[in-house]
A protein has these predicted regions:
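Flexible, polar/acidic helix-loop-strand segments at domain edges
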Residues: 88-95, 309-377
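Bacterial N-terminal signal peptides
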Residues: 9-18
Length: 492
């Protein structure tokens, strides 16, 4: 069915990444071919689509993931030992620096998305067109601007606030609080203005919705430690009745669940290897046989051991050698196994991959059609559970926590029993663990550890330094371009 992932092909971008030797080192994508500001309803649509197109930029969907899972205890660099050792490897052991290759490109692609959103916000109000559609475009742009700024503030702290397409050349950093205030204002406007998911269809399937804005607000407030607001927005999503859990866990991230009942917001893509696709799955796919990708972002032994015995989510998250998926036996690349050291100091060789990016196909050139889920309903349920527990409502929290576990057990009553714990501290730990095994390799774990204060204890053995590694360094190239207007994060 035609939908927004197909529509975005009208926004012509140069898609330049074709080999893993270029990982995190390709040139930024080109600008929109039509730089003139929008003046018609058709222009307004194209300009709004361009804001979404940033989601499929290499440096957003794949260039940014080392800053997510690889910095956590859920994954490590993967691929072969020498592949991207100097680009991705430093994120694995916290030896990255302000001049780290790729860091500036992630920063720049987020600001490019913001620039495109600013064009819509500034110019579309002046266009004579249907007012309801005009307001929807504005809300979509502000939702995406809020998303991009949230990515920035989590990663770097307070950042330059740019709300016009042509800002001053040297913009100082705003405070962290002011950055969050802009994010919340954008997302509140989106939540008040956007239609619910059920009102979209056909060409508009996959656009930002009221539920997506509310869910992102819940995530923002949870990161801020404002549990009252996090509870309120998570419950808005739940009470809307627009969402549910896929019956099968693998469908929550697989092709059969694209734009499905569990998807609150996802990056649409098609398997063409062109501007309609992305390489998020390709970068993490199985090396060797059946040759589905480059094998980055490999699950850690620690993640494997986090799953309870018999939890079906383990096989729905981790591909092991010898697994048979869609009739294909996974043999991997025996020449590049991962060498890990167990608690007894023994070196063991393990080769495993991210099951959540598996796509049926025949070669690496077909692995462009993965719709990456940015917000799942299971995440919303767990955000609600966490917020309710922090707000001294443990019994209510258990309702939503156990909904996630019920789906996970897949009808097997002998595993994953309902949680009954109501002690606040104990339940907090249980919910954080449930987030880990439910949302593994989806880019949440590092931020969960940072916001809960668990990062020093959990990641310290991997190289994490408290007071430094909660944020990334501001790219040195950006500080140089600003002639010192931008200041570096402390300890960096």
């Amino acid at each position: 069915m035609k939908n927004i992932k197909n529509i975005l092909s009208i926004v012509l971008l140069t898609f330049l990444l074709w080999g893993c030797e270029d990982f995190l080192s390709v040139n930024p994508q080109s600008e929109l071919t039509q730089e003139a500001y929008p003046t018609t309803a058709a222009d307004a649509l194209q300009s709004t689509n361009a804001v979404y197109a940033t989601l499929r930029d290499w440096h957003y969907h794949s260039g940014g993931f080392p800053i997510l899972d690889i910095m956590s205890d859920d994954a490590h660099k993967g691929s072969s030992p020498d592949d991207a050792a100097n680009t991705v490897g430093p994120y694995d052991d916290f030896t990255h620096s302000p001049t780290q290759d790729g860091l500036d490109r992630w920063w720049n692609v987020l600001y490019e998305g913001i620039r495109r959103a600013n064009i819509v916000v500034q110019e579309v109000p002046t266009i004579e067109m249907n007012e309801n559609l005009k307001n929807r475009y504005l809300a979509e742009a502000r939702f995406l601007r809020g998303l991009y700024y949230f990515d920035l503030v989590r990663a770097f702290g307070g950042v330059p606030l740019v709300t016009s397409p042509e800002p001053e050349l040297q913009v100082p950093r705003a405070s962290r609080d002011d950055t969050f205030a802009q994010i919340i204002a954008d997302l509140e406007f989106a939540a008040e203005t956007l239609p619910p998911k059920s009102e979209y269809g056909g060409d508009d399937l996959g656009r930002a919705t009221r539920g997506a804005a509310q869910a992102l607000l819940a995530r923002v407030y949870l990161f801020r430690g404002d549990f009252a607001q996090a509870e309120s927005y998570a419950m808005d999503v739940i009470d809307s009745g627009e969402y549910g859990l896929e019956p099968e866990f693998v469908d929550a991230n697989g092709q059969d669940g694209e734009h499905g009942i569990e998807s609150v917001f996802e990056i649409g893509a098609v398997a063409t290897g062109s501007v309609e696709g992305n390489q998020y799955a390709n970068t993490q796919g199985v090396r060797g046989t059946p040759n589905r990708g480059w094998g980055f972002n490999r699950p850690s032994i620690d993640l494997r051991e986090a799953f309870a015995e018999g939890d079906p989510r383990e096989s729905g998250t981790i591909i092991e050698l010898g697994d048979v998926i869609d009739g294909i036996e996974i043999l991997g690349d025996s020449s590049t196994p991962d060498e890990m050291t167990d608690e007894q100091g023994n070196v063991i060789q393990i080769e495993s991959y991210n099951r959540k990016v598996w796509i049926p196909g025949t070669s690496t050139n077909t692995q462009f059609g993965h719709n990456r889920r940015l917000i799942r309903y299971a995440d919303v349920l767990l955000m609600a559970a966490e917020a309710l527990n922090e707000n001294n409502q443990p019994v209510a929290a258990l309702i939503y926590l156990n909904q996630v576990r019920e789906r996970a057990r897949q009808g097997n009553a002998s595993i994953l029993p309902d949680i009954t714990e109501t002690n606040k501290d104990a339940l907090r730990d249980i919910i954080l663990h449930e987030r880990r095994v439910e949302l593994a390799l989806e880019g949440h774990r590092f931020w969960d550890l940072v916001r809960t204060g668990e990062a020093p204890d959990v990641l310290g053995p991997l190289g994490f330094t408290e007071g430094k590694h909660e944020v990334l360094p501001i790219p040195q190239s950006e500080i140089d371009l600003s002639q010192g207007t931008l200041t570096q994060n402390e300890e960096w």
